[in-house]
Amino acid sequence: MFEHETVLKWESIKGLNIKPDGIYVDCTLGGAGHSEEIVKQLTTGHLYAFDQDDVALAHAAERLAAYEGRFTLIKSNFVHLKEELEARSVTKVDGILFDLGVSSPQLDEGERGFSYNFDARLDMRMDQTSPLSAYEVVNEWPYNDLVRILFTYGEEKFSKQIARKIEKAREIAPIETTFELVELIKDAIPAPARRKGGHPAKRTFQAIRIAVNDELNVFDRAVYQAIDLLAVGGRLCVITFHSLEDRMCKQAFKEKSSLPELPQGLPMIPKEFEPELRLVTRKPITAGDDELDDNRRSRSAKLRIVEKMKES
């Protein structure tokens, strides 16, 4: 069963400012929690929802069956956002949502290899047809590449120690499972550091997952496509779960909402220099106390919202 607790659901739905006749895109369908709330508010409008996961798509088709005709499910990575929509004759939309968290079932179903709490073959592929899995990263990538992803994507200060431990272990035998990797990570991190900051494998698993799915590069490309696809007055909502994604989102929004350097004393800003976006939220929205109590995964969630002010 594909059960997934939607994070910042009402804040993001409100942020989209949904019109009953609007065209909307959920780039991260997952458990369809956001998608269901969007289609509920549509009459003549339409929702396009993306996911790479066959299980998620099948579950969503069932969950949204009562709204037949108001939605289209697309099996694709959102890096192909513009291409997939244009193939369906959609060139402008009224709202786009990204929820960049890994779906709870992907974390909780042990066989997917996303979680350090379940023993499974190293996998972590969101798209099960992708050739690169966590197994290849852990067993085949050079030491320097392991250090780079652990430090950059996981912000792991013991990246060198962990990479060295992995390198030595795989010389003896391949590292096959999540628990084998967890034990190596625990051995690599000094005992005092293991006792604080959550599970010792958390940062390493995040880093490998990001590398396997090329998450940061994919999001960086997709967010600019999303900005371009918005009609004037359209909203873009992005929910991030770690500082790398949030920084990337913040930078893209800042770039598109800032004025260029202009001579001082201009009586008015020439129209061609007006920014493309308006920041609806200057600071990110975070989960309230009730949601924090109900869903621990909401602790790191940040929602940023922008509105399209003019065509680029």
Swiss-Prot record:
UniProt xrefs under SUPFAM superfamilies: Putative methyltransferase TM0872, insert domain, S-adenosyl-L-methionine-dependent methyltransferases
Keyword rRNA processing appears in the UniProt entry: yes
Cell compartment(s), UniProt: Cytoplasm
Catalytic reaction list: cytidine(1402) in 16S rRNA + S-adenosyl-L-methionine = N(4)-methylcytidine(1402) in 16S rRNA + S-adenosyl-L-homocysteine + H(+)
Main location, first listed in the record: cytoplasm
Keyword terms: Cytoplasm, Methyltransferase, rRNA processing, S-adenosyl-L-methionine, Transferase
Pfam families found in the cross-reference section: Methyltransf_5
Enzyme class (EC, first level): transferase
Alphabetical GO biological process terms: rRNA base methylation
InterPro entries per the UniProt record, alphabetical: RsmH (IPR002903), SAM-dep_MeTrfase_MraW_recog (IPR023397), SAM-dependent_MTases_sf (IPR029063)
EC number: 2.1.1.199
Residues that hold S-adenosyl-L-methionine according to the record: A32, G33, H34, D51, F78, D99, Q106
One GO CC annotation: cytoplasm
Key word Nucleus present: no
A GO molecular function held by the record: rRNA (cytosine-N4-)-methyltransferase activity
Protein's job: Specifically methylates the N4 position of cytidine in position 1402 (C1402) of 16S rRNA.
Family: Belongs to the methyltransferase superfamily. RsmH family.
HAMAP family assigned to the protein according to its UniProt record, in alphabetical order: 16SrRNA_methyltr_H (MF_01007)
PANTHER family named in the record: 12S RRNA N4-METHYLCYTIDINE METHYLTRANSFERASE, S-ADENOSYL-METHYLTRANSFERASE MRAW
Protein name according to UniProt: Ribosomal RNA small subunit methyltransferase H
Name of the coding gene: rsmH
